[in-house]
């Protein structure tokens, strides 16, 4: 509906589309008036993701709804005036226009089209002012009902933003505990020759795609050979919901196999050495601090993210109206508080889905849960990292508002 993502352009697209739909309904005899203001006055809510342009669009749309309401109220009030009463108001407005133009001489120097435009704008503003005066005569309750326009954010995006906040907040944990070795830095190293000779060319892009596809295929074949089925690594290159958390779960579940695979790759290379990226990955897999983060993210994904999405988007969801999910969202925060107070519900011999999972149902990926428990004894700070993640996630700005 819009050629770009500016909020103003999107609003214009909405207005144009509603006008088209409403006119079609009028031509089809489904509505008695070809006036889209009837639609906008009935609209009471807007549902979108949490992007800044969408939140601004909500504000603009609310103002548009209010503007149209005041116009209709003004028109109704004007119809109740006598001709002389309305003519008097227009005359007073015209006098103001003449004064703003510099007096009668300045007014006459304006073109006919410009004078007509200013008079038309004055009449529109007069209608709005009368409508606003009529609105102000309503009680506070009536005003609230007239201007009712709610915004609800996308649950999926809200959880994604909260999860991202928790991940970013992990850096704070290591900064606050300098006595503990932080995750191993994994610096990039660009292929300078490729950049100089073919940066941005189609050939370079195709070569990169073929390389990535080849590595993925080799990994799938290796997993199929080792465990009897292949695994597609989550597409973390794209903005796909929960792909990063799912990737952490996959890595920790098959950590030994990933390390074994990279060793296999190294042994089968003519140079007998991994490239920079492959060596980075192998170093990260061996890094104890990185394993702490992989396990903490996996536990959060299993305990909160998956059951949360089951409730708001799953086939057995109890409610499909976001306005009725306020109690559920409060329960999410309450459960996170429980896990902060009792991390043993997720880590340790007494950890279980009954106490640890938001919905107390079986783990979506029990293999990932048990893999974390296997590595937990060798991760002395896992509980502290997990609690820090949960605290940061709970306090991400706006987390309590859905």
Give the location of each predicted region:
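Electropositive, glycine- and tryptophan-enriched low-complexity nucleic-acid-binding patches
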Residues: 1-37
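A eukaryotic "domain-edge + linker/cap" signature
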Residues: 20, 28-352
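Long mid-to-C-terminal assembly/interaction modules of large eukaryotic proteins
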Residues: 321-402
């Amino acid at each position: 509906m819009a050629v770009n993502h500016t909020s103003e352009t999107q609003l214009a697209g909405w207005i144009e589309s509603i006008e088209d739909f409403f006119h079609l309904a009028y031509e089809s005899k489904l509505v008695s008036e070809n006036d889209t203001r009837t639609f906008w006055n009935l609209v009471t809510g807007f549902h979108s993701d949490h992007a800044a342009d969408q939140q601004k669009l909500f504000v603009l749309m609310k103002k548009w709804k209010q503007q149209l309401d005041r116009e209709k109220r003004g028109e109704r009030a004007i119809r109740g005036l006598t001709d002389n009463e309305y003519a008097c108001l227009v005359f007073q407005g015209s006098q103001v226009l003449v004064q703003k133009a510099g007096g009668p001489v300045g007014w006459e120097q304006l073109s006919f089209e410009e004078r007509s435009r200013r008079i038309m704008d004055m009449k529109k503003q007069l209608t709005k002012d009368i409508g606003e005066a009529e609105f102000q005569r309503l009680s506070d309750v009536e005003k609230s009902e007239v201007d009712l326009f709610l915004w609800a954010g996308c649950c999926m995006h809200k959880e994604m933003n909260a999860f991202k906040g928790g991940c970013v907040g992990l850096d704070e944990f290591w900064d606050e505990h300098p006595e503990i070795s932080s995750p191993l830095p994994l610096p990039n190293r660009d292929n300078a020759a490729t950049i100089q000779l073919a940066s941005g060319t189609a050939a370079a892009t195709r070569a990169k795609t073929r390389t990535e596809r080849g590595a993925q295929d080799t990994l799938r074949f290796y997993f199929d050979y080792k465990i009897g089925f292949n695994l597609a690594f989550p597409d973390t290159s794209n903005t796909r919901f929960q792909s990063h958390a799912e990737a952490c779960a996959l890595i920790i579940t098959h950590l030994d196999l990933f390390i074994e695979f990279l060793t296999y790759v190294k042994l089968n290379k003519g140079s007998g050495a991994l490239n920079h990226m492959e060596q980075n990955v192998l170093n990260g897999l061996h890094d104890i601090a990185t394993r702490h983060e992989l396990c903490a993210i996996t536990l959060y994904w299993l305990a909160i993210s998956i059951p949360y999405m089951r409730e708001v988007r799953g086939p057995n969801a109890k409610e499909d109206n976001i306005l009725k999910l306020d109690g559920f969202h409060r329960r999410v925060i309450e459960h996170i508080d429980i896990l902060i107070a009792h991390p043993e519900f997720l880590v340790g011999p007494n950890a279980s889905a009954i106490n640890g999972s938001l919905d107390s149902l079986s783990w979506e990926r029990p293999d990932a849960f048990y893999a974390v428990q296997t590595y937990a004894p060798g991760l002395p700070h896992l509980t502290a990292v997990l609690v820090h993640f949960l605290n940061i996630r709970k306090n991400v700005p706006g987390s309590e508002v859905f």
